[in-house]
A protein has these predicted regions:
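N-terminal helix-loop segment corresponding to the beta1-alpha1 unit
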Residues: 1-91
Length: 91
């Protein structure tokens, strides 16, 4: 049985607990979630619950501080229906 969000692509730039848990609910409803991580990975990978919070999604590394990384992210964003982020203001 298809989920309610089947066919929806979400880019996940969130970190911590709240963002990934919110996106997890969307993924469990059938959304195609792609987690965009900085080089070196998400700093929250060290926590035991990380694999639970970020299940049901694919992951890519993208350096948003480089021109090549920004270009790659823009191409990826052009294919997405939604973007979830938890960046600090002005980032």
């Amino acid at each position: 049985m298809a989920g309610a969000l089947e066919g929806i692509r979400i880019l996940d730039l969130s970190w911590g607990i709240a963002g990934p848990l919110g996106v997890l609910l969307l993924a469990e409803q059938g959304a195609d979630v792609i987690k965009v991580e900085p080089p070196g990975g998400d700093p929250f990978r060290v926590y035991d619950g990380y694999k639970v919070w970020t299940r049901s999604r694919r992951s890519v590394t993208c350096d948003l501080k480089s021109d090549a990384g920004v270009d790659a992210f823009r191409k990826l964003a052009a294919t997405a229906d939604m973007l979830v982020e938890s960046l600090r203001p002005g980032a």
